[in-house]
């Protein structure tokens, strides 16, 4: 890959579709951006170390969300308490994530690390502990659990029931360009709920395991043990439990 192509920004249409009524405040639909679609990008986690935050230090900057900063920092601390990841407010670093108030219900994050300004948009639909944790998972380099190449062994995806703008988040990736970390996790902070991104009155995903459920990330309050091990493995955290 050439330097020029690496820094080319892919213009991606992002649509975070929030359903009305009781689900109106939940994370739902398309919520991640990629600076470039390339073999560097895995679908369980980023493939190459060059796309991970150097030394596991995530540099961030707030440009809005004044009244939500304490909550966002609590989510960051939850990650730091369970992994070797640390979060540092920006001084003059070139590579950092800008955290801001997105338009209406727009929630998305640029994937992994780049040596320039990245975005983490937290609109009205993403201001819960779980939704912020989900987006920070993308910032660290985690993709959606339902995109794993082995996902069909664990869930049924109903593509016809998914809103067009969110179909990309349900695309299954191939084993030849994907490194899968750990077992499938029905409870992962990175998996969608069974009605997320749905067309009216339909289900987008069902589990194959009896007794398992799929819950919207906005209703969750922590990383699972498997989420933690995946991050620790991805960043090769010393002294931490890894796969």
From Swiss-Prot:
Its EC number is 3.4.24.-. Residues 44-238 form the Peptidase M12A domain. It is found in: Secreted. Expressed by the venom gland. GO terms for cellular component: extracellular region. One of its GO terms (biological process) is proteolysis. Disulfide bonds join 84-237, 107-126. Its cofactor is Zn(2+). Binds 1 zinc ion per subunit. It comes from the Eukaryota. This is Astacin-like metalloprotease toxin 3.
